[in-house]
Amino acid sequence: MWLDERLLALFRRNFQSTLTYWSVFFSFGLCIAFLGPTLLDLRCQTHSSLQDITWVFFAQQFCLLVGSTLGGVFKRTVKQSLFLLFLSSLTISVVFVIIPFCDHVGVLALVMAIAGLAMGCIDTISNMQLVKIYQQDSAIFLQVLHFFVGFGALLSPLIADPFLSDTNCIQSNATQNGSRNLEHIRNSLVPHHPRNVSHYVLPLQGALVTQVSYAFWIMAAINLPVPVAVFYLIYKKGMVPGCHIQNGGLLSADELAMEMHKENDSQKIEAHEEHGHAVSLLCCQNKKIWNAPFTFFAIHMCAAVTLFMTDGIVGEYSGFVYSYAVEQPLNLAHKTAGYLPSLFWAFITLGRLISIPVSYKMAPRSMLFINLIGVTATFLFLLLSQNSTTGMFVGTALLGLWLSSVFPSMLAYTEDILNYKGCATTVLVTGAGMGEMVLQILVGSVMQTQGSYSFLVCGICLSSLAFTLYAVLLVVDSLHNRASEDSACKPPGLDGEATSYQS
């Protein structure tokens, strides 16, 4: 048996909840990946310039960060979390329906901002609830969760592709000239970096010819079962006002033993709190959080900044690898270079699939160590083989594999240090989102001023910083464990300052 009986029993016990959280993350993946391929058609729909339409990316990403923080506010009860997940997943379907009717770039940006809020809530709550359900076994289920977001992100462009315009979707006298560079412009569009395409001029007035609306409506239909599944979970848990479900099923022997084990653990935790050693609940006790040891804050900071770097690498590499490949020293054809971002995301999804069985056998901290070493080594390989087309494709695939499981592994590891209270999830999700947005701007500006060769140099610097911060996190983890052991050995009341933040 691939999974042990205890884990299978736990999964069966929480099957519906787990499957619902996975499906919601599929919805998140659909929404996060559709904007890039459809942006030129949306430019035509809103009759806006390339510089204006790229700021729709910013509206989505910024509100995703806000939504991630907002999602952390609703973590106190399962009922609050599920109702917010229902509203968020339903919002995404509504957004897909509304987008074809947005004929002004400001209205489109507002709609995408609302979608970003919904996506941020989904990101935080889904991760957090799985951590709360599975605790020390959460790593494998987090890997599956992030596979679903990758699967949704792969499916979204495939749905959109048949409906994208092969020629300029605004018919005018300049259409023929603009259409020659259309595929190159589509691949060069990067969020938050409008200067990347500022030298291209496309017509703003003329007859609109686009069928991209059908792509959005198809994605809305595909996503619609997700809010239905969330609502059904709310109903099954008896959280719908006026509807109370009686669960009269008997537990199996394994499930009964597991429930008894949970009750015993809860009693131990409560007894531990009575003696003033519930450090893991500090994040929920705002009045006492500032009395926590420095290691508590250092763990959050090191983990969040590491993800700031790694998710930033994902964003900047997928955004600029095409622009790097079509210039010196590679000078790839536009069509050939266009495969690189797709290859990168395909191997991220494949890596997340591979990480599911690996995470069952390997601890998250070990996976992180191997992944971060692999990312740095791959950038060195890319730099050494910068004149090789084969090396570029191999390096891109390897980079996607190494980066694929960093976030779920870091989340599982950090929550393990902090005893699985879901406290770090909001901080880590926000840090990762900020990295993806900020580092795209930073790397894009460096490439603009220093040339395309700086693309790989930035990658080496960022990956080295990420590994260094992870090494610091390992040291802080050791110090935190030592401090916790020392605190547990002291009788309550001997050290007033130590117990003030724990009581």
Curated annotation (Swiss-Prot):
It is a multi-pass membrane protein. The keyword Transferase does not apply. Residues 484-503 are annotated as: Disordered. Pfam families: MFS_1 (PF07690). One of its GO terms (cellular component) is membrane. The keyword Membrane applies. It comes from the Eukaryota. GO terms for molecular function: transmembrane transporter activity. Its main location: membrane. Signal peptide: none annotated. The chain crosses the membrane at residues 19-39, 53-73, 82-102, 105-125, 139-159, 214-234, 289-309, 338-358, 366-386, 392-412, 427-447, 455-475. Keywords: Membrane, Transmembrane, Transmembrane helix, Transport. InterPro entries: MFS, MFS_trans_sf. Belongs to the major facilitator superfamily. This is Major facilitator superfamily domain-containing protein 4A. It comes from Xenopus tropicalis. The gene is mfsd4a.
